[in-house]
């Protein structure tokens, strides 16, 4: 099974946060916007409420967030998702929620977009030692789980990405980088944590295809590969579910995947990271990586007594 080896990252200049805030106000006043460009034809403004969940850091430029992605269903290169996702159809969409629940059901995208949406400005740390600061739009995963009434025997939550090789060229062909569907999982207490959200947008608009439209998981204290995209199924289970990268290379990608600068990837250090969009054209901006990506005060208690070098 091939394992991805990241290239050296080239960064660009900073976009001040005020530019995003001014742009968001314009979008709200306009009531919606359809963007030109590959993979973004479905973008529309979203109504959000204020949220206390934010970081006092410069936002990563939107052009970087939407053009520098890992989404192997559209290809293994960073530009492939934006280039190859124009034909993907994120609507109509349904998400099946089943397993160890009292009220299994399917949710339509319109139902999910009608939930109270918040903007959450989170750090995002990739296992490849680069990071971004992204203004997500979404709702707590716990609020969706409450609607299906998890049983007492439920201990984990499993997620699956859609399989559409006719629209996702990375899923087509004989040689595949990963087995499909892409799968991920969390412990139930992780899934119900207030920081864990299902995102339906970023930068005040619906998600572009290359960023996981129409629905993706965001768990800000974990490495980015846990943020499964284009979700079509959520199942509650009694045992830990299979996770794609953990199955592909268990010595490199753990089930928990908590950001931990003290536990290196076998092929590179996790002590520092390169913040995308900063550092100028020729250089990189290395900074220290924070335990749990800076969210230790909120989530470290979930792992009390665990050896995080073993449970990585």
Swiss-Prot record:
Domain of life assignment: Bacteria
Cross-referenced SUPFAM superfamilies: Oxidoreductase molybdopterin-binding domain
Cited Pfam families: Oxidored_molyb
CC cofactor: Mo-molybdopterin
Keyword Transferase part of the UniProt annotation: no
Keywords annotated in UniProt: Metal-binding, Molybdenum, Oxidoreductase, Periplasm, Signal
Transmembrane segments: none
Catalytic function, reaction form: L-methionyl-[protein] + a quinone + H2O = L-methionyl-(S)-S-oxide-[protein] + a quinol; L-methionyl-[protein] + a quinone + H2O = L-methionyl-(R)-S-oxide-[protein] + a quinol
GO biological process, one term: protein repair
Cell compartment(s), UniProt: Periplasm
Assigned GO CC terms: periplasmic space
Family classification: Belongs to the MsrP family.
Identification of the protein by name: Protein-methionine-sulfoxide reductase catalytic subunit MsrP
Native species: Sinorhizobium fredii (strain NBRC 101917 / NGR234)
Name of the gene encoding the protein in the UniProt record: msrP
């Amino acid at each position: 099974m091939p394992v991805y080896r990241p290239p050296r990252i080239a960064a660009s200049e900073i976009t001040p946060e005020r530019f995003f805030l001014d742009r968001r106000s314009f979008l709200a006043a306009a009531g919606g916007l359809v963007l030109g460009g590959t993979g973004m034809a479905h973008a529309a403004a979203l109504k959000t409420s204020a949220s206390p969940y934010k970081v006092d850091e410069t936002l990563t430029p939107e052009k970087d967030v939407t053009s520098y992605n890992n989404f192997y269903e559209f290809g293994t290169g960073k530009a492939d998702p934006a280039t190859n996702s124009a034909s993907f159809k994120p609507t109509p969409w349904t998400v099946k929620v089943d397993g160890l629940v009292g009220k299994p059901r399917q949710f339509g995208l319109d139902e999910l977009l009608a939930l109270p949406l918040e903007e959450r400005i989170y750090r995002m740390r990739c296992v490849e030692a680069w990071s971004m600061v992204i203004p997500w739009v979404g709702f707590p995963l716990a609020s969706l789980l409450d609607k299906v009434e998890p049983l007492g025997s439920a201990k984990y939550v499993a997620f699956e990405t859609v399989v559409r090789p006719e629209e996702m060229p990375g899923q087509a062909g004989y040689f595949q980088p990963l087995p499909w569907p892409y799968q991920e999982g969390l412990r139930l207490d992780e899934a119900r944590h207030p920081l864990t959200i299902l995102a339906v947008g970023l930068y005040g608009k619906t998600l572009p295809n290359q960023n996981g439209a129409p629905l993706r998981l965001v768990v800000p204290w974990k490495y980015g590969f846990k943020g499964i995209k284009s979700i079509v199924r959520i199942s509650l289970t009694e045992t830990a579910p299979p996770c794609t990268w953990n199955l592909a290379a268990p010595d490199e990608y753990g089930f928990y995947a908590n950001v931990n600068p003290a536990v290196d990837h076998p092929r590179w250090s996790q002590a520092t990271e390169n913040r995308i969009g900063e550092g100028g054209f020729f250089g990189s901006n290395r900074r220290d990586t924070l335990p749990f990506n800076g969210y230790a005060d909120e989530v470290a208690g979930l792992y009390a007594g665990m050896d995080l070098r073993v449970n990585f």
